[in-house]
Amino acid sequence: MADLLGSILSSMEKPPSLGDQETRRKAREQAARLKKLQEQEKQQKVEFRKRMEKEVSDFIQDSGQIKKKFQPMNKIERSILHDVVEVAGLTSFSFGEDDDCRYVMIFKKEFAPSDEELDSYRRGEEWDPQKAEEKRKLKELAQRQEEEAAQQGPVVVSPASDYKDKYSHLIGKGAAKDAAHMLQANKTYGCVPVANKRDTRSIEEAMNEIRAKKRLRQSGEELPPTS
C-alpha cells in the first residue's frame, strides 16, 4: 500500500519553480502586447481606408481634376488605395523605383493616360502634353519624308550629259556633244574612244581632233589624214 501511494505521488506534476513562473508570465505579457498591436494595426487600416475613400470621393466630384498624385506610401497602404480606386470605378498606377518612395496616381476613366504618359512617369519625369505633341508631329514628318524618298527611288545620273556639261566651256557645246556621243557609243571598252579596239588615242588627243575638225568646218579647209 505504501509503495502504491509513493508511486502515485511521484507521478504527479511537481509545482513550477520560480524560474518557470517568470517565463510563463513574460510569455503572457508578450502575447498580450502582440494582440494589442494587431488591433491597433487593424484600426489604422480602417481609418486609412476611410480617409482614402473621402479623398477619392472628393476627387470624383471635382470636375476640374482629371488626375491626382498621392504622397509616397508603404506597400499595404498602396494596396488599400488601389482597392478603393477600383471600387470607385477609377484607374490607378504606382510609380517609383524604391519601395519607400513609390506613390499612387489615380485617373478618371475618361482621361486614362496614354502609354507615352505612363512611360514618362516611370522615368520619373513630369508629363508635358505640348512637348509630347511636338515630338509626335516631328516623328510623323520624318516618316512621311522617308516614304516620299522611297517612292521617288534612286537618282539616275547620265554620264553623257555630265561629260558634255563638264567640257562645254572648254571646247564649245557642239564639240562637247560630239565627244559625249563618242564616249557613249564606245562605253563597252572604257572611257577612251575606240575604233575596232585598235584606237589607243587619249581623251586629249580625241578632243584636239574634234577642235581641229571644228576649225576646218568654220574655215572651209580640209583636215589632213591622221596615222
From Swiss-Prot:
Disordered as annotated region, ranges: 1-46, 118-160
Modified positions (N-acetylalanine) in chain numbering: A2
SUPFAM superfamilies named in the record: R3H domain (SSF82708)
Pfam families the record matches: R3H (PF01424)
Biased composition (Basic and acidic residues): 21-46, 119-147
Modification Phosphoserine occurs at: S114, S158, S202
Main location: nucleus
Key words, A-Z: Acetylation, Nucleus, Phosphoprotein
Organism: Homo sapiens (Human)
Protein name, per record: Sperm-associated antigen 7
Motif position, Nuclear localization signal: 35-51, 122-139
InterPro entries: R3H_dom, R3H_dom_sf, R3H_sperm-antigen, SPAG7
MF terms (GO), sorted A to Z: nucleic acid binding
Tissue specificity annotation: Detected in fetal brain.
Segments forming a coiled coil: none
